């Protein structure tokens, strides 16, 4: 623990906590101050000036990052018949029906994305208490409740991310790995920022993005100037 604290202090010394960096500077600093011994994940965090208690100010969606996330996603699909075969052909890791519900209720959670055809939502609904808190419940808004299961699987495997504002208006998203070229992280960051800007509620007032930062798995947070995006 002492070693980690020393590494964190060294990382913090390289950052001006009073400054909001340009996206390019922030990405470079995130890579420079990362001290994890593994290929750490790079994540961005937004605080938005929205009131999520209002139905028209709830932000939720999905997008495919231009350079992927660097993470291998394990995709589970609830489907039957031809759609089940379609999901398997597209590369789904797990495909099934009731037997998967029982397995998940038994504590199995070795997957990252859940996709379902609309007709399967009646049985998937039984998993609400398990999948809901983990943000894994299939939803039409994120493209995970669909008849086009092949597309959903391929997008999930190809760098699709989902995002949702919490009760305080915070949104987090993975934009890649520390090992990515800086230009690719910047491109992913800008693409995600575009999605956040497009999702701005028409009824939102004042400054939309009140705080923005970038961090790695074990690294310090670095403030980012939203205007640089």
From Swiss-Prot:
Name of this protein: Large ribosomal subunit protein uL1
Keywords noted in UniProt: Repressor, Ribonucleoprotein, Ribosomal protein, RNA-binding, rRNA-binding, Translation regulation, tRNA-binding
Any one cellular-component term (Gene Ontology): large ribosomal subunit
Family, similarity comment: Belongs to the universal ribosomal protein uL1 family.
Record function comment: Binds directly to 23S rRNA. The L1 stalk is quite mobile in the ribosome, and is involved in E site tRNA release. Protein L1 is also a translational repressor protein, it controls the translation of the L11 operon by binding to its mRNA.
Quaternary structure (record): Part of the 50S ribosomal subunit.
Taxonomic lineage from the root: Bacteria, Bacillati, Bacillota, Bacilli, Lactobacillales
HAMAP family: Ribosomal_uL1_B
Taxonomic superkingdom: Bacteria
Pfam family, one: Ribosomal_L1
One record GO biological process: regulation of translation
Species this protein is from: Streptococcus thermophilus (strain ATCC BAA-250 / LMG 18311)
MF terms (GO), sorted A to Z: rRNA binding; structural constituent of ribosome; tRNA binding
Family annotation (NCBIfam families): rplA_bact
